Amino acid sequence: MTRPSPVLATVARLPASAAVLVAAAALLVTPPAPAQESPQPSRADWLREARLGLFVHVLPASPSDLAKIDDFDVEALAAQVEAAGARYLVLTLGQNSGFFNAPNAAYDRRTGYRPGERCSRRDLPLALHGPLARRGLRLMLYLPCQAPNEDARAQEAFGLARGPRDQPIDARFARLWAEVIGEWSARYGDKVAGWWFDGGYARVRFDEEIAGIYAEAARRGNPAALVTFNPGVMLVRHTRAEDYTAGELNEPFSVVPSSRWVDGAQWHALTFLGSRWGARDTRYPVERWQEWLGKVVAGGGAVTLDVGPNWDEKAGPIGSLAEAQVAQLRALGAEGR
């Protein structure tokens, strides 16, 4: 039961005429409640303070690609993230191909793959954490909301329909997928500051129950970990379970925060610096990015920019970023600070 306020308790003891006067006075002096509130303190406070982060799509699509995870230069990438002025890095664990950047025994047991066959033997998130942490930078992880849609064997093993597209999911599937999520979360503990889950679409029947199952698994190792679930190209609070908005945007410049909060979730946008996701070029002059980032930061938001890691050993260290992108990011990092 809600405890009555002191003003209301006093009114209840007064004659009717006096009660009316007191109640009217209370309306004049009581400030209006904020339009959008969030629990304080919020798990997402550090994200607001970070302002700018980077995202890298590391998506091996074959055994030869997976072998390159052994050569991924984590020191080079961490140094570039720091030089860019970003405060965190989001790394993909995997996506559609069925190849993943870290070992996972739960996944291997469910699918029947041998260790190292689909999940790399090198634990890339663990390898990245050290160089990032020494620089005061945080690590976050990306994972789809369902088994890889280009691996029919995995789809069948998790009880999904086979086919190269996102399949309908339910709570039964979510509990199986949560075993995979939970193994990674338990291993990494507080080394992972948050999760960005892709494919939380209405068309695959993603719902609050599934979001809750995934959020619990993602926080198995770190109760303070942030989670969000991507509903598509939009910036909204999609579920009650999320701490910040997924905020996927293709053309971001017209989208700015009017408040730090979106229905109680931290305002956050994710878009790409290059011409497309994972590209290594630049698509806009740095001044346009500076203007937008300045507005976002002033409004209490945070921005994650996707950049392209190198996969050609002849072009430089595996996993390193293009100098053209790093140059833009240095200017943006200064703006974010």
Task: Please place each PLM-identified region on the residue numbering.
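Sec/Tat signal peptide C-region and signal peptidase I cleavage site
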Residues: 31-35
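Serine/proline-rich low-complexity intrinsically disordered segments, especially terminal tails, linkers
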Residues: 7, 17-19, 40
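Mature catalytic domains of secreted/periplasmic carbohydrate-active enzymes
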Residues: 36-337
